[in-house]
Amino acid sequence: MYEYAIYPFDYMRITQSHNDGNHVPHWKNVTNYSDKPWDEASKDSGRQYFIPQNDYVVEQVLIDSRSVRLRTKNNVLIPYKNEPVTLYITLTHMKLETMKRLYVGQLIKKNEKIILEGDEGGAYGNHFHCTANIGTYYGLKYNNNKKWVFCYEKSLLPNEAFYIDPDFTHIMNPKGYDFKEVPIGYRKGDSGTDIEKICNFLSNFVKGNYYGDYCEACVSVYKKQHGIVGDGTTIDSQTLEAMKKDGLKL
């Protein structure tokens, strides 16, 4: 069963979106290289950690720009597409003390606190300058709008790259981004037993074999049977309530 890409900060306080201020020239009216960054300042003006909810591997450490490129160790499910992909993210503005702890090939495990936000590399106040991406990496490029960008095959908005686990991330300011919650059974407090119970329950309503994630496929069929609209693979509150009425016990 594939894992979901979870937003890697315990507090969401996005202070600048991709379409605000000096982030706009990163992508608008660009004829060559682009990315779509956002700034995550976390809980307060102090220094907070990047707290991964998936395992990541360090791809590149760029001391001069105070940046690091990471990729998920495993393929993950992201809101942008319904198939597992390798997700690439970049973080910028860390202090030198943090940069010296990082090296290529380093495994950063789930919940491991290594990367601490900072205010270096042209930053105003402590925060992470972030990008999320999929596909081929073409390099740190200087675009026709005179901005340095992390150029990948496809740059994603934060809500296209990550799901939210409401038991982990406290949302203070999503800056207009509409995030999806990770399905029930995959959250921080959920156990594998819940997944097994849900799959066994759904097998009473759905017959036959399905490709991909069996539980997700069954959820989609169940929701259609019950006239529930929305993301076909997500066990939202309405779906969970319907399941409980049909006899699901967690």
Predicted feature descriptions by range:
Residues 187-191, 207-217, 231-240:
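A glycine-rich, coil/turn loop motif that links secondary-structure elements
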Residues 221-250:
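Extracellular LysM carbohydrate-binding repeats and other cell-envelope/extracellular binding modules
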Residues 1-79, 109-110, 119, 123, ...:
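Surface-exposed, glycine-biased beta-strand/turn segments
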Residues 169-209:
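Acidic, Ser/Thr/Pro/Gly-enriched interdomain connector segments
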Residues 98-125:
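Beta-rich strand-turn-strand
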Residues 1-13, 41-48, 100-103, 109, ...:
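Acidic, glycine-rich catalytic/binding loops that coordinate metals and/or anionic ligands
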Residues 125-131:
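Histidine-centered divalent-metal-coordination microenvironment in nucleic-acid enzymes
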Residues 111-114, 216-223:
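Conserved hydrophobic/aromatic packing and binding residues within compact polymer-binding modules
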